Curated annotation (Swiss-Prot):
Gene for this chain: CAPNS1
Ligand binding (Ca(2+) 1): 104, 107, 109, 114
Sites of Phosphoserine modification: 6
Swiss-Prot/TrEMBL domain comment: The contact of the 5th EF-hand domain from each monomer allows the formation of the homodimer and also appears to mediate the contact between the large catalytic subunit and small regulatory subunit for the formation of the heterodimer. EF-hand domains are paired. EF-hand 1 is paired with EF-hand 2 and EF-hand 3 is paired with EF-hand 4. The fifth EF-hand domain, left unpaired, does not bind the calcium but is responsible of the dimerization by EF-embrace. The first four EF-hand domains bind calcium, however it is not sure if the binding of EF-hand 4 to calcium is physiologically relevant.
Keywords from the UniProt entry: Acetylation, Calcium, Cell membrane, Cytoplasm, Membrane, Metal-binding, Phosphoprotein, Repeat
Residues involved in Ca(2+) 3 binding: 177, 179, 181, 183, 188
Coiled-coil regions listed: none
Gene Ontology CC entries for this record: calpain complex; plasma membrane
Residues noted as binding Ca(2+) 2 in the record, renumbered to the chain: 147, 149, 151, 153, 158
Modification sites for N6-acetyllysine: 174
The keyword Metal-binding belongs to this UniProt entry's keyword annotation: yes
Full protein name: Calpain small subunit 1
Taxonomic path: Eukaryota, Metazoa, Chordata, Craniata, Vertebrata
Positions where N-acetylmethionine occurs in the chain: 1
Length: 263
């Protein structure tokens, strides 16, 4: 077993997927109708290489302490069939359920390819969002970190949770793109991440900029969303493993590989 020490600082605001958010049904309705709508370090040898390996690990692992304690997203709901309508569902949720049936295909699940097509159709209707488009590898990663039952696809509740977050984070992105460049600059990034519910330390911000931003430190929309989806998933994973709330977790090698390889 190895101990993952706390890495982040401060308190995140309320994140997560509470409710569908304003205009979600309209956005997807527009999509259907056509309306506008730093990589890991090399392994050290045995014995004397342990200290170096741990220092590298400490700089890479996004272990979550105080920030995770104050980040309280709703858990991804259990998978249910899209047609299982609950009596207390709002009309907006029911409308989303009907649209999901059109988007998901015959198996009523959203694959990485289907997610990529959906997201790229949406962003083409928002010329103010600078993006190279959502690639298949990005969408595979997004599906993996949201795939609570490891089917390789997103069911209705999983997709609804993801979509709700994307809509919320799109609003944050536009709010903090103060120079209207279509990107988030390195100076705008901390405020944007805090508004999205994540308050990180400077070291992790620098890591994120190197991983998700261009050479000028600017982050476009697809990288912004991809990064936040990953952060949300890592926060939730850490909180689920930190059962006693100490800000530390212990995982064995199999648990670590499962957590990191399918993401």
């Amino acid at each position: 077993m190895f101990l993952v020490n706390s890495f982040l600082k401060g308190g995140g605001g309320g994140g997560g997927g509470g409710g569908l958010g304003g205009g979600l049904g309209n956005v997807l309705g527009g999509l259907i109708s056509g309306a506008g709508g730093g990589g890991g370090g090399g392994g050290g040898g045995g014995g004397g290489g342990g200290g170096t390996a741990m220092r590298i690990l400490g700089g890479v692992i996004s272990a979550i302490s105080e920030a995770a304690a104050q980040y309280n997203p709703e858990p991804v709901p259990p998978r249910t069939h899209y047609s299982n309508i609950e009596a207390n569902e709002s009309e907006e949720v029911r409308q989303f359920r009907r649209l999901f049936a059109q988007l998901a295909g015959d198996d009523m699940e959203v694959s990485a390819t289907e997610l990529m097509n959906i997201l790229n159709k949406v962003v083409t209707r928002h010329p103010d969002l600078k993006t190279d488009g959502f690639g298949i590898d990005t969408c595979r990663s997004m599906v993996a970190v949201m795939d609570s039952d490891t089917t390789g696809k997103l069911g209705f509740e999983e997709f609804k949770y993801l979509w709700n977050n994307i809509k919320k984070w799109q609003a944050v992105y536009k709010q903090f793109d103060v120079d209207r460049s279509g990107t988030i600059g390195s100076s705008e990034l901390p405020g944007a991440f805090e508004a999205a519910g994540f308050r990180l330390n400077e070291h992790l911000y620098n890591m994120i900029i190197r991983r998700y931003s261009d050479e000028g430190g600017n982050m476009d929309f697809d990288n912004f969303i991809s990064c936040l989806v990953r952060l949300d998933a890592m926060f939730r994973a850490f909180k689920s493993l930190d059962k006693d709330g100490t800000g530390q977790i212990q995982v064995n090698i199999q648990e670590w590989l499962q957590l990191t390889m399918y993401s």
